[in-house]
Amino acid sequence: MEAGYAEIAAVQFNIAGDNDHKRQGVMEVTISNLFEGTLPAEGGIYDARMGTTDHHYKCITCSHQRKQCMGHPGILQMHAPVLQPLFIAEIRRWLRVICLNCGAPIVDLKRYEHLIRPKRLIEAASSQTEGKQCYVCKTVHPKIIKDSEDYFTFWVDQQGKIDKLYPQIIREIFSRVTYDTVVKLGRSKNSHPEKLVLKAIQIPPISIRPGIRLGIGSGPQSFHDINNVIQYLVRKNLLIPKDLQIVRGQKIPLNIDRNLQTIQQLYYNFLLDSVSTTATQGGTGKRGIVMGARPAPSIMRRLPRKEGRIRKSLLGSQVWSISRSTICGNSDLHLDEVGYPISFARTLQVAETVQHYNINRLMPYFLNGKRQYPGCSRVYKQITQSVHDIEGLKQDFRLEVGDILYRDVVTGDVAFFNRQPSLERSSIGVHRIVVLENPKISTFQMNVSACAWYNADFDGDQMNLWVPWSVMSRVEAELLCSVRNWFISTKSSGPVNGQVQDSTVGSFLLTRTNTPMGKNVMNKLHAMGLFQTTQTDPPCFANYSPTDLLDGKSVVSMLLRQTPINYQRAPTWYSEVYAPYMHYNKQDISTQIRNGELIEGVLDKKAVGAGSSGGIYHLISRRYGPQQALKMIFATQQLALNYVRNAGFTVSTADMLLTPEAHQEVQEIINELLLESEEINNRLLHGDIMPPIGLTTHDFYEKLQLNALKFPDRILKPIMNSINPETNGLFQMVATGAKGSNPNMIHIMAGIGQIEINTQRIQPQFSFGRTLVYYPRFALEAQAYGFICNSYIAGLTSPEFIFGEMNGRFDLINKALSTSSTGYANRKAIFGLQSCIVDYYRRVSIDTRLVQQLYGEDGLDARQLETVRFETIMLSDQELEDKFKYTGIQSPLFEEEFSRLKKDRDKYRQIFLNIENFNFSQLLTDVRQVPVNVASIVKNILLSSATGVLPFDEKTILQKYTMVKTFCKNLPYVFINNIQERLQTPIPVYLKRAASLMRMLIRIELATVKTLNITCEQMSAILDLIRLQYTQSLINYGEAVGILAAQSVSEPLTQYMLDSHHRSVAGGTNKSGIVRPQEIFSAKPVEAEQSSEMLLRLKNPEVETNKTYAQEIANSIELITFERLILQWHLLYETYSSTKKNVMYPDFASDVEWMTDFLENHPLLQPPEDIANWCIRLELNKTTMILKSISLESIINSLRAKHPNTYIMHSVENTASGIPIIIRIYLRESAFRRSTNTRMATDEKIAVNVVDKLLNSTIRGIPGIKNANVVKLMRHRVDAQGKLVRLDNIYAIKTNGTNIFGAMLDDNIDPYTIVSSSIGDTMELYGIEAARQKIISEIRTVMGDKGPNHRHLLMYADLMTRTGQVTSLEKAGLNAREPSNVLLRMALSSPVQVLTDAAVDSAVNPIYGIAAPTLMGSVPRIGTMYSDIIMDEKYITENYKSVDSMIDML
């Protein structure tokens, strides 16, 4: 009978009590001795019944040697009970809620029935139980005191009498608690409080605390420190009387009390970390013991941190052997190959089983042995099941079938290639090894175009390479991890690889028209030479004579014909910026490939560059597969490099030098900038700079200087006039996108300009008012603040060089500080989303809990998308009718078709206009990513079977229309199956929506007016191809889309921070780049957000186009507190008087004059009789009042309304220049009265509190709006003719701070278009669905053009809002989303605390996701392991055919 097997479905965590320990223990430890002679002492802590780690003796329990014995726990019977150190807080809770006399609950259990189970005991223990009377025995419950000096001691304070609660007494109290009480308080029966006090503790097996014996008998020996702790524990336990009885309130001998405390401390150190080697630590009472010069180790110390058991041993994967070396480039290698040094190949070994078909191939390895490469090192003999070293074999040793030969690595073996940090799944790829025979080479070599997978370069990067051993692992590696699988990026949906640098320039030069001196025109022989290293099928040159000339386009077309595609796009080479300064050949302005023939244009970055979405390699991959695209990249690269080697290409200093005339023109431009900067300085010195609302004079001055010192676009003119674009290598690299940019070219040739650090000029931080030692204090010239006039080629002065290095130093420090934050954020994202897996319905779920009804709302794989343009979106009604309405046949079907196209257009506009209105920067566009490029399929079908324009009858046209209509109707059945399509079962609404964008595109591209020259057979083929590609583009079952989303978002976010030093020297770095992502992913509340903003549209259309009116409204909503309007204030203790004689403070004697005038001008505002002796004197800032448009009258009225217990006097508003506006606020006696109307003593604290309230008083505006400025928006709207019009003259208000509700109450603000960046504020006002959309838009806004595919953003948003509340990606959010997945939360952080809480709650952890199965030693159910494979062994046996039987049949 065969034994069955089963997978672990769930794990339950419980508190282990005495009975559990006794049941699991195989022996009882009674003595502290380790050994008796050479054998373990019986009953000692090294008893052989607990296992063995020594080859001298076997385990008595299982009779196995040390390699096979897993170890067995023992027990130590305590003479006196001890508290379980992990559950001290739980013990305290139970003591607070149960009667110490009878064990009945003190609290009313019905009050806590509505709470979830884990919260009941916690809430009950937090209630007031001191002095309560027990419902059963009427005993008054005492006060439970936890000793502040001792972590383990509890005291009872009952009517002033304080008694110590020893563990034995606590155990007796807990033994009276009924199971019914335990369950009603939310705990499981398995978590009875009696288990929290132990009489028998478990001793761990010897295998986890091994000893190292350095000799036999009396020789030296060394043991694990934890054994010493156990020894002390046993010895101290023997000092306690066995029958010790402790009665509550009775004192025990001091020596016994100390021994009990020491035992408790030892048990704590045995389980948990020792926090200190001193007597106590910070008053916590956690004492520490010392083993030599270090704290004692513990069992729980092995779990947390990177080196702990969980992350290092259980979640981490270790390989037997691995190689690591520096990488360098080698263009002769394919993208899927890696050059491997021969010294490494002779060290790493590959295990290969000898079979009939490979014994002849393996025999040379066996004969070469270790002497010659390729050889082998060991042989595993199947008959004897033993391993033999190849050098120690006898002469008669034979290699037989079934043996395993450990041979050297040879060319053609597959290997894993990895670069850390592994932020994406493409960071581990499988390559084919090419052994480098040169013994001097010791580096890995790879194709330059392959670096994109690993984000690697050749500046000293090191990578890892290891070879899978078994046949199964080699096959799995090649199928699942081959680099061809990573060619299309999951993050951006575009190709990862392409031509870079030299090969990009070479492709451009080869395909140019009319190259100088005809360098890309060659004869037959030279053309054949270019193909020599492409490793493709050579094109046929038989039709060319030796005298025929071929240009570069013809040569490239010979290669492209092997994978015919159609391509049309403007190249990077053509730019409107360069057009005024250089002549473009008309044939190079647009690149067009027709059926594999390069008709016109050039190949540059946009066509063949790395990461070019929609480029040539992307199209080849979509039509012919990624393997063919990689071959084409290599072949094109070889063509380009071979051409560059022959024709020559270089960048020299001559390419960087300006002509004297151009240099003079550059200097004139720079002088103009410096003059403008000097004018701004003069305005500052004369006080003529008036900053707008929200900016200080200094900030506005710095902003003016930054704008004035920016290089204008016309600085390119002298550069372009001094170079020859046809021959200048530097310009050609920039213009083709191979390397560099316009700012780089300007910095090299013209000037560097203003250096910015954190978006600011260099600040005077060297000393007071000084930027560097080279400039005097308070210098205002632009050069003193980081403006560099010279270029790199001209050379920098000392201060200019220092300014440039300042930015580099800031970036390096910023990178170092951000690495840890982004790395941990990546890890939290991985753990937070890893349980999200696609099921058989293409839903995303966590175990059985739904996250997305359909992955990405359309069920598509992000790697299977193309960018297409929807032609109808930007057309007006009349244009749409002219272009798409078929009028050749009078039929209601074509009216229906046009009506459907118009509805599709309007629906598209409605959706994306709404998105535009509620996002800061996302504008409507007619370009979208879809799984099928219908226009390309139609073009390919027509080119492959050209029929010309043929007349078709009405029946054929109607038939084609019906075919398209039926196809669009049935397209959503792709998500279900063919059976449901045949039955025409109802389609769920969400599936119809998923296919809506694709159906719109099909109706546009297959409209009747566009398919007149297509036959019905061609139409059928087109629809079949569309369906096939659409089906292949669906996400696979079992895909771990959560991890894909985490990688796709975290990697560019991490790279955004780490690449700060790669930005332009004058671009600077914004240190707040990491703040906003942390706010989003941490789900911070509104009050904790540092960078929240609002965008407010105005209700009145006329005001919306008037910047002045918009600014007035912005002023009115900006929060102005009284404190912002004050220059200085004084709190005076003086008696009110209107004469100079009684003024206590002579410095303010002049106030009497305006106070007298105030009383004369305001006869109704005479001082009251109850004025106290406290006065608040304030001087107002007239400049701020003018800028904020606030009058003195409005300030006074606001203060009087909010503070009636004061008497306010003020000077006139229109004072002379230099004379401030003064307000005196006298406190009245009522401000110093209690609610009982009794007079309080005059107190300075009360007066200070009144001052604080006055300063924080709101004068005007909406709370939360710190600043408000007018910004110009670009938005779309549909006019009366149905045309989409772009509006550029709309003004809106952008605020710093958020308060949606307050903004909705303002009559000038349109409440329907309020946009806030705050997720919390949006959630509070609009609900969870609005918060979900806000998460998506905020991540997209933060990441900008580096953002990933929106499906990954949807994954984040749906997971964070799945519970109905916005949960963070932090530990707290994971606890809320997956409270039952204890193993996952334990793997993330704080494993000891997570395990403790799980045991208290008796948590049941179902095994799902990735971390939990991995920790349990099983295979996660994802990817190819998601689907179960059922094999009929009986059928295979019955139908098995041997080679001989097949030959007989033939």
Curated annotation (Swiss-Prot):
InterPro entries (alphabetical): DNA-dir_RpoC_beta_prime (IPR045867), RNA_pol_asu (IPR000722), RNA_pol_N (IPR006592), RNA_pol_Rpb1_1 (IPR007080), RNA_pol_Rpb1_3 (IPR007066), RNA_pol_Rpb1_3_sf (IPR042102), RNA_pol_Rpb1_4 (IPR007083), RNA_pol_Rpb1_5 (IPR007081)
Signal peptide: none
GO molecular function: DNA binding; DNA-directed RNA polymerase activity
Organism encoding this protein: African swine fever virus (isolate Tick/South Africa/Pretoriuskop Pr4/1996)
Induction: Expressed in the late phase of the viral replicative cycle.
Cellular component, GO, one term: virion component
Function: Catalytic component of the DNA-directed RNA polymerase (RNAP) that catalyzes the transcription in the cytoplasm of viral DNA into RNA using the four ribonucleoside triphosphates as substrates. Forms the polymerase active center together with RPB2. Part of the core element with the central large cleft, the clamp element that moves to open and close the cleft and the jaws that are thought to grab the incoming DNA template.
SUPFAM superfamilies per the UniProt record, alphabetical: beta and beta-prime subunits of DNA dependent RNA-polymerase (SSF64484)
One Gene Ontology term from the biological process aspect of the record: DNA-templated transcription
Subcellular localization(s) per the UniProt record: Virion
Catalytic activity: RNA(n) + a ribonucleoside 5'-triphosphate = RNA(n+1) + diphosphate
Principal EC category: transferase
Key words, A-Z: DNA-directed RNA polymerase, Nucleotidyltransferase, Transcription, Transferase, Viral transcription, Virion
Name of protein: DNA-directed RNA polymerase RPB1 homolog
Domain notes: Lacks the typical C-terminal domain (CTD).
The protein's Enzyme Commission number: 2.7.7.6
Record Pfam families: RNA_pol_Rpb1_1, RNA_pol_Rpb1_2, RNA_pol_Rpb1_3, RNA_pol_Rpb1_4, RNA_pol_Rpb1_5, RNA_pol_Rpb1_7
Subunit structure: Part of the viral DNA-directed RNA polymerase that consists of 8 polII-like subunits (RPB1, RPB2, RPB3, RPB5, RPB6, RPB7, RPB9, RPB10), a capping enzyme and a termination factor.
Family: Belongs to the RNA polymerase beta' chain family.
